[in-house]
UniProtKB/Swiss-Prot annotation:
It comes from Pyrococcus furiosus (strain ATCC 43587 / DSM 3638 / JCM 8422 / Vc1). PANTHER family: CRISPR-ASSOCIATED ENDORIBONUCLEASE CAS2 (PTHR34405:SF1). Keywords: Antiviral defense, Endonuclease, Hydrolase, Magnesium, Metal-binding, Nuclease. One of its GO terms (biological process) is maintenance of CRISPR repeat elements. It comes from the Archaea. CDD domains: Cas2_I_II_III. This is CRISPR-associated endoribonuclease Cas2. Homodimer, forms a heterotetramer with a Cas1 homodimer. Its cofactor is Mg(2+). One of its GO terms (molecular function) is metal ion binding. Pfam families: CRISPR_Cas2 (PF09827).
């Protein structure tokens, strides 16, 4: 499955969330990560994020897709993701 993770978390947790997600996904731009994961990896990511965030004040949205969708970028692409064939 392909996931896109977007988050809005307290300043004191931003670096922890970013560091955690970098271990599993590709950084796209500020507060956005994406990548191909297995179901087990997806569950580990969810559980890891739950341990870091404050569910009463932070927000994490995870979009689940079957595969990497076509993408159109307006402006500069901060971290281009190349498809590996």
């Amino acid at each position: 499955m392909y996931i896109v993770v977007v988050y809005d978390v307290g300043v004191e947790r931003v670096n922890k969330v970013k560091k955690f997600l970098r271990m599993h996904l590709n950084w796209v731009q500020n507060s956005v990560f994406e990548g191909e994961v297995t179901l087990a990896e997806f569950e580990r990511i969810k559980e890891g994020l739950k341990k870091i965030i404050d569910e009463n004040s932070d927000s994490v949205i995870i979009y689940k897709l079957r595969s990497m969708p076509p993408r159109e970028t307006l402006g500069i692409e901060k971290n281009p993701i190349e498809e590996i064939i």
